[in-house]
């Protein structure tokens, strides 16, 4: 009854209007799962391959018909007849079919779409919500949101070098309150920016993209908005940054054009340490570039005891890259993006490896998203305690927040909000 009888993929659009892969999986029982695959703007060189057609006559070369054909062709032919509850076996079969180290033949977007849709169909077959099916009886921790309220870098058309300025409402009683607190700060920030003469257009992830060039000016606006919304920075709400510094690491230097700075690795660490000394910043993602291992080591030695140092481009949700980082003693947290590695099984393996090494995990969206809310379920399934899913606008971001509210309601009295437990030191 849990046998897969049909797998069908199609090309749909993501939140940036670019094509992506959506997959439907149907079981013999009638159970059904659907998953849409996200895509990133600032992508790590070590990520699994997102297969694009390259046909410039369609979608400027960004079509995904080849990935769709791979699903509807050889993947479906191989997997129809499999038991959907054998997630590991299904994912392993697709990885072996692909036969490359980075899923470059079939495409990680093809493999992941099937992997997630299978999990959803199996969850429906077993009459469980996805978070419970994947995480088991212990899945009950609601994550602290990292809410990206000012966008820069590759996510916005402004001169801000740092890609994401985020707030983390750790003092909330539950995830519902955390989302409310974030919304109140978001709307207060809009008024503050407008009063300062800045535009209030939004970036890819729903945060504002004002024509600010100074990191400190952006942070000051956020602090003022937190206070005017009735909260205390560094007590009720903390700050987090995603530098995405690989994007401005050129020729061995951190070229921060918006700020007019050209920094060595050591100077970049000094720059970030000064920000942490002056602002209540508790998390920095990709503070150093993906292959600047010496810079990462300096950063970890300097700030790792008191600041969460998240590897995104550094680790790319890949157990091999993570193992390398653990052995080198760099970073203390892994950003979890399912499409960086390309299957649910490998994602869960990486999360478990990070957990065993006492690294934290942060479940994350991509800048190119859809209405698919799978990562909300995965955040609870893994009890990771933190989620990055954008700002308090754009339905592609709010779909995840709304799903967290539903999950918290489903869990009832056993639900736990991670809150202050995520703080270091």
Curated annotation (Swiss-Prot):
<feature type="binding site">
    <location>
        <position position="337"/>
    </location>
    <ligand>
        <name>(2R)-2-phosphoglycerate</name>
    </ligand>
</feature>
<feature type="binding site">
    <location>
        <position position="388"/>
    </location>
    <ligand>
        <name>(2R)-2-phosphoglycerate</name>
    </ligand>
</feature>
<dbReference type="InterPro" id="IPR020809">
    <property type="entry name" value="Enolase_CS"/>
</dbReference>
<keyword id="KW-0964">Secreted</keyword>
<protein>
    <recommendedName>
        <fullName>Enolase</fullName>
        <ecNumber>4.2.1.11</ecNumber>
    </recommendedName>
</protein>
<comment type="pathway">
    <text>Carbohydrate degradation; glycolysis; pyruvate from D-glyceraldehyde 3-phosphate: step 4/5.</text>
</comment>
<feature type="binding site">
    <location>
        <position position="163"/>
    </location>
    <ligand>
        <name>(2R)-2-phosphoglycerate</name>
    </ligand>
</feature>
<keyword id="KW-0324">Glycolysis</keyword>
<feature type="binding site">
    <location>
        <position position="285"/>
    </location>
    <ligand>
        <name>Mg(2+)</name>
    </ligand>
</feature>
<feature type="binding site">
    <location>
        <position position="366"/>
    </location>
    <ligand>
        <name>(2R)-2-phosphoglycerate</name>
    </ligand>
</feature>
<dbReference type="InterPro" id="IPR000941">
    <property type="entry name" value="Enolase"/>
</dbReference>
<feature type="active site" description="Proton donor">
    <location>
        <position position="205"/>
    </location>
</feature>
<dbReference type="InterPro" id="IPR036849">
    <property type="entry name" value="Enolase-like_C_sf"/>
</dbReference>
<feature type="binding site">
    <location>
        <position position="367"/>
    </location>
    <ligand>
        <name>(2R)-2-phosphoglycerate</name>
    </ligand>
</feature>
<dbReference type="GO" id="GO:0000015">
    <property type="term" value="C:phosphopyruvate hydratase complex"/>
</dbReference>
<comment type="function">
    <text>Catalyzes the reversible conversion of 2-phosphoglycerate (2-PG) into phosphoenolpyruvate (PEP). It is essential for the degradation of carbohydrates via glycolysis.</text>
</comment>
<comment type="similarity">
    <text>Belongs to the enolase family.</text>
</comment>
<keyword id="KW-0963">Cytoplasm</keyword>
<feature type="binding site">
    <location>
        <position position="242"/>
    </location>
    <ligand>
        <name>Mg(2+)</name>
    </ligand>
</feature>
<dbReference type="GO" id="GO:0006096">
    <property type="term" value="P:glycolytic process"/>
</dbReference>
<feature type="binding site">
    <location>
        <position position="312"/>
    </location>
    <ligand>
        <name>Mg(2+)</name>
    </ligand>
</feature>
<dbReference type="Pfam" id="PF03952">
    <property type="entry name" value="Enolase_N"/>
</dbReference>
<dbReference type="InterPro" id="IPR029017">
    <property type="entry name" value="Enolase-like_N"/>
</dbReference>
<feature type="active site" description="Proton acceptor">
    <location>
        <position position="337"/>
    </location>
</feature>
<dbReference type="GO" id="GO:0005576">
    <property type="term" value="C:extracellular region"/>
</dbReference>
<dbReference type="InterPro" id="IPR020811">
    <property type="entry name" value="Enolase_N"/>
</dbReference>
<keyword id="KW-0460">Magnesium</keyword>
<dbReference type="InterPro" id="IPR020810">
    <property type="entry name" value="Enolase_C"/>
</dbReference>
<dbReference type="GO" id="GO:0004634">
    <property type="term" value="F:phosphopyruvate hydratase activity"/>
</dbReference>
<keyword id="KW-0456">Lyase</keyword>
<dbReference type="Pfam" id="PF00113">
    <property type="entry name" value="Enolase_C"/>
</dbReference>
<dbReference type="GO" id="GO:0000287">
    <property type="term" value="F:magnesium ion binding"/>
</dbReference>
<keyword id="KW-0479">Metal-binding</keyword>
<dbReference type="GO" id="GO:0009986">
    <property type="term" value="C:cell surface"/>
</dbReference>
